[in-house]
Regions:
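C-terminal accessory helical subdomains adjacent to catalytic cores in phosphodiester-
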Residues: 1-20, 30-51, 57-208
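Helix N-cap/beta->alpha junction signal
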Residues: 25-26
Length: 208
């Protein structure tokens, strides 16, 4: 696996399982992770914790301070933010600098361009979660073959579901059913695949 330039991983692996701390900008991202992490064998509070910031500006402003103040040993950090209209590399670089300045171990992942791109990458999960079976057939359409390229993924998902998708409750329903397969990858969102790979990298910090 190619190493990401925005990763700070400890080359000296310990025998103790790391504690994963996820830093996210909004409650919907928390719900997404709560649907994914337990299926990777992690238990909230015992194996992981999610810090929810009050939007992007709050994340950018307070991230370094929160990371510096963190005291739990053997912790590794996952920082997740939407790209939105920003330059992906610039957004990632800015967060990486804050991680580096804090002295903590971890990595940065960006949802290209919005969290909903993860869901548009697995329309079968959306169809099952929202009980709209016909949705799955749209996965091979040109628009949804590469959901990371959509500038308005949230709006697209709302229209596609007849506005049945709501950010927090929809994330809770859909994330629990998202495919976590990486070999072969099922989800068409490359940024979701990168997120899963990053989580597995962080967890591997505690393996011999």
């Amino acid at each position: 696996m190619k190493k990401d330039e925005f990763e700070l991983l400890d080359p000296i692996q310990s025998q103790k399982k790391p504690f994963l701390v996820c830093c996210v900008e909004e409650p919907s991202a928390r719900e997404m992770l709560l649907g994914v992490l337990p299926r990777l064998g992690l238990r909230e509070w015992e194996d992981f914790q999610i810090m929810v910031f009050q939007g992007k500006q709050d994340l950018e402003k307070r991230l370094e301070l929160r990371l510096r103040a963190w005291q739990r040993p053997q912790s590794v950090f996952l920082i997740l933010r939407d790209q939105d209209s920003g330059d992906c590399k610039a957004v990632k670089q800015g967060l990486f600098w804050k991680l580096m300045a804090s002295g903590q171990t971890g990595l940065v992942r960006i949802a290209c361009r919005e969290l909903e791109s993860f869901y548009l990458g697995d329309l079968q999960a959306v169809a099952n979660a929202l009980a709209i079976p016909a949705l799955a057939q749209y996965q091979n359409s040109q628009k949804f073959r590469g959901p990371d390229n959509l500038n308005n993924a949230k709006q697209e998902l709302q229209k596609l579901t007849g506005f049945h998708y709501q950010e927090v409750s929809g994330s809770r329903q859909i994330a629990a059913l998202l495919s976590l397969s990486l070999d072969p990858p099922i989800n068409r969102s490359h940024s979701f695949q990168a997120l899963l790979q990053g989580i597995l990298q962080l967890l591997a910090q505690g393996e011999k």
